[in-house]
């Protein structure tokens, strides 16, 4: 029946601290005196009882009291019976014994304190044992162990239970009591900040909330938060902790003095005060010295250190803290390579701090420079995110099928899967998107890679380099970016081989315009016959195809068998329309979305027949012949689609613009070169038609005797200094020994100037024993050079949030996501007179509530006095 806790550690068999007689006297008093439960319910928790039966009886009394019912013997017996607990506590005899042994409830308050004391001693013993075990966990970093140990001891001092499952009825009772008190004006919903309109909108700062106050420099972020700290400390008499990572405590106190004494800070800094200024200064010093404001100006402080300081302050003051202010977020240390994820981890830790101490935590945050580039410089929620955004036409690769959807069409959706890169394994994995959203109109730049991949993004959007995530405005020409080496395909077949083959021919050389005969044009009779039979296989007797020789061409007309009327369409036109590719001119053509989600065998079939139209497979002559396969089209979208379909087969093709000066529309060539990619093309795509088959055979025979020379699928040379050299030092390997072990002639440091092939990277990784280099050599990524970054104007931009992996594939490039904001309340500051000297809002500051998890958003206006860096209330707006 005793409390189920582990109390080993001192090697004795002593019982844990407890007082059974006091527990029985308390319960007997509750059963005898209807007022007794009200005297102890606020100080005595259920878990304090050592005997489990006593916990059940006390819980029954608490439930009855909360419902306004008496706690006499009959009522408690009835409640225990209804909840099937009577037998477990020892039956009616147990309750009768408690009543018989109790004379009165006169000393119940003292007894409750005694039982709580024994409970806290037991908790202290439990915490001590757990701390002993923590001391042996040497794999954990010492600051983490110390923080966890401190947290366990701190938990013992708290009056409320620190953890465990709580029945919803208990929480509902507490909520109802709070609502009732607020309705009667007894209690405020949150901690008033002193600004009336802001309090009206937020209902005060709620305990356990993380609040972000953001703005560009000179908007008054620090002044605003110091005003909040001053107001809460002065009016609520609650301790306020200020952690200043940017300014010293002397500078902060000087600001508080200037604001409180109404003396310009310049006079305080110089010490040149007039006779009339000494009295308000003395009065301000007297008032501030009585306020419970505590400042820590340790630079680069961690959340763990803050938590420790805040716990200690709360224990010393003996009351809950009123506010914690952190100035500012970006200066905090998080211990990670990826700054975006590091800041996300910091904000989650701050949210945990707010919940643990039940105190509002305000973190100041610097907004990105993107605000300055806009015409309207009012900040938006998206400015707070560390990551940037993409234009609406950016194609996001979904999982598992590999459909590519414009990001603008995903806005408002969540819970769908995309392909993302696991940075630990450098393999593609499925990840779930939690949010897709627009972030407004912003300046964008077009980034183009050597392969011809293009993406338009804001300057602060991050891309993955060999050195980690880098903003677009930090990238340079010839720097390598991370791209997927292949895109996984779906195994669910929804189209037939005949359908995808016919589709390839019609997209390539078909005329499918409205009010025009559906026809296919080719120079080769075997291709004409192929289309003839494919059409019959797909549509059967519904069409009557015919081949018509015309000069040096063959036309295949795909006519409907039935006479066409207003309500009866050609079956071929109807089918193409259902796929979204009917009525397109050559420069408008693209691959239907449905094809992207087909198995690779069908994708190969489509490409094989498409290549027979405007594709080329040949050996380019000269002193040194070179094999090449390319597809030519005047449609940029079709070229991108073909490049993407090849990527699904593991073929990394390049996309090149081929200008047609004076000859018509520009052409786009999707080129396949290099032995590995051409081998894959021959194996997986192949050819159809006698002409293409002969050319393919020539290339096959050439490649059989060709030595592979890596110049595209490489690992950037930066890894020599980043990974290889440190690994060599750890295994005490010289440069000459490295050359010898990887089987290459000694060339000194010149070796480090060359990119690595995957084969060489595998050898080097084995020699220097580098798991990081081995992961790169076996990865799913392709490192592609940047060839240009150009400004593209302003446009509406969008982004995704991908919890966990924090990235996704857009336009066949690995890009970072926007991390979800953990804050419960986001406040942004804006002063129009800072940007516009002739504004009618001179002297006004806009406090923009951009996010409010439990209430409305909107804008509150305050007076801002720059002379004393002080925010003041306007007349009450009656919000």
From Swiss-Prot:
List of residues binding ATP: 215-222
Record note on modification: This protein undergoes a protein self splicing that involves a post-translational excision of the intervening region (intein) followed by peptide ligation.
Family: Belongs to the helicase family. DnaB subfamily.
Record GO biological process: DNA replication, synthesis of primer; intein-mediated protein splicing; intron homing
Domain SF4 helicase: 184-451, 614-878
Organism from which the protein derives: Nostoc sp. (strain PCC 7120 / SAG 25.82 / UTEX 2576)
Superkingdom in the source lineage: Bacteria
Name this protein carries in UniProt: Replicative DNA helicase DnaB
Protein's job: The main replicative DNA helicase, it participates in initiation and elongation during chromosome replication. Travels ahead of the DNA replisome, separating dsDNA into templates for DNA synthesis. A processive ATP-dependent 5'-3' DNA helicase it has DNA-dependent ATPase activity. The intein is an endonuclease.
UniProt xrefs under SUPFAM superfamilies: Hedgehog/intein (Hint) domain, Homing endonucleases, N-terminal domain of DnaB helicase, P-loop containing nucleoside triphosphate hydrolases
Alphabetized GO MF terms: ATP binding; ATP hydrolysis activity; DNA binding; DNA helicase activity; endonuclease activity
Catalytic reactions of this protein: Couples ATP hydrolysis with the unwinding of duplex DNA at the replication fork by translocating in the 5'-3' direction. This creates two antiparallel DNA single strands (ssDNA). The leading ssDNA polymer is the template for DNA polymerase III holoenzyme which synthesizes a continuous strand; ATP + H2O = ADP + phosphate + H(+)
Classification via SMART domains: AAA, HintC, HintN
EC numbers: 5.6.2.3, 3.1.-.-
Domain DOD-type homing endonuclease: 502-651
Assembly, per entry: Homohexamer.
This protein's UniProt keywords: ATP-binding, Autocatalytic cleavage, DNA replication, DNA-binding, Endonuclease, Helicase, Hydrolase, Intron homing, Isomerase, Nuclease, Nucleotide-binding, Primosome, Protein splicing, Repeat
Alphabetical list of InterPro entries matching this protein: AAA+_ATPase, DNA_heli_DnaB-like_N_sf, DNA_helicase_DnaB, DNA_helicase_DnaB-like_C, DNA_helicase_DnaB-like_N, DNA_helicase_N/primase_C, Hint_dom_C, Hint_dom_N
PANTHER family listed in its UniProt record: REPLICATIVE DNA HELICASE, REPLICATIVE DNA HELICASE DNAB
A single Gene Ontology CC term: primosome complex
